[in-house]
Regions:
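Nuclease catalytic cores that cleave nucleic-acid phosphodiester bonds
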Residues: 125
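Acidic, divalent-metal-coordinating active-site segment for phosphoryl/phosphodiester hydrolysis
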Residues: 152-163
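Short secondary-structure boundary/hinge segments and terminal tails
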Residues: 72, 156-157, 235
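Acidic two-metal-ion nuclease catalytic site recognized across multiple nuclease folds
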Residues: 161-249
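Short, glycine/acidic-enriched loop or turn micro-motifs at the edges of active sites
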Residues: 12-14, 121, 157
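Conserved non-catalytic scaffold segment of RNase H-like nuclease domains
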Residues: 1-115, 128-149, 175, 186-189
């Protein structure tokens, strides 16, 4: 059984790693089944923070303006993760955002890969009768203290949830699904699996785009809620198109 891993949780501006950004990273390092270290950082995303995300997480635009940028935090997070197995609740969500940010900063090594453990996947297999398998609801079901929608709190709760699920279903074979499996089958279900997410590095904003965007911002007296210098080529194109649509050419 896996006793050494790092639990990861990311808060983001939305659900799509292609367009959205990380605003908070939380990670918990586990060795021999015990938490030995923690990582938590807000991240300045360089784009506007949707109001619904503030309502969900309690994180404000003002806090993020004071936070470190992705170019500082992502290298620190990768160092913390090392080559560990990554535990998450819907682990591919967090892994996809992490890898996109790392690839765009040329931080992802060609040979780099991780195995993953997913408490959402396990709960779907062993707790099909529950009306919801969101992390908050599973924590309520098992009496686990939980600070919802903050990265470190979610990561810590995921560690506790994984421990409970492993003991209840893998070790003790409780419940209908587990009772129908052999010990070997249960251990295989709880074994880490390869995390595979393919992404290409996005090109940075072109000088012509930068010049055009600064000109449009000045012309229409727009105060940007993003960092022009850190935009990708695609992001700059979408913003320029949006300005043209709003103000005309």
């Amino acid at each position: 059984m896996i006793e050494n891993y790092t639990a990861l949780d990311l808060e983001t501006t939305g659900l799509n790693p292609k367009y959205d950004k990380i605003i908070e990273a939380g990670a918990v390092k586990v060795r021999n089944g015990e938490i030995i270290d923690r990582f938590q950082q807000l991240i300045r995303p360089g784009i506007a923070l949707p109001e619904k995300i503030t309502g969900l997480t309690g994180i404000t635009q003002e806090e993020l303006l004071e936070a470190k940028g992705s170019e500082t935090v992502i290298p620190q997070l990768l160092d913390f993760l090392e080559d560990d197995v990554i535990l998450g609740h819907s682990v591919m969500f967090d892994y996809s955002f992490l890898k996109k940010a790392a690839v765009n900063q040329n931080l992802w090594r060609p040979e780099q890969s991780h195995l993953g453990l997913d408490t959402l996947r396990l709960s779907r297999i062993y707790l099909p009768e529950l009306p919801s398998r969101r992390l908050a609801d599973l924590c309520l079901h098992y009496g686990i203290r939980h600070q919802a929608h903050r990265a470190l709190g979610d990561a810590e709760s995921t560690v506790q949830l994984y421990s409970v699920l492993r003991k209840e279903f893998c070790e003790n074979a409780l419940g209908e699904a587990a009772s129908k499996q052999t010990r070997e089958e249960r251990e295989k279900t709880f074994a880490p699996f390869p995390l595979i997410y393919k992404i290409k590095r996005e090109s940075p904003i072109r000088p012509q785009q930068k010049q055009k965007l600064y000109s449009l911002l000045e012309q229409h007296k727009i105060i940007p809620d993003y960092d022009v210098e850190k935009l990708t080529r695609n992001e700059a194109s979408r913003i320029i198109d949006r300005i043209y649509f709003t103000y005309g050419r």
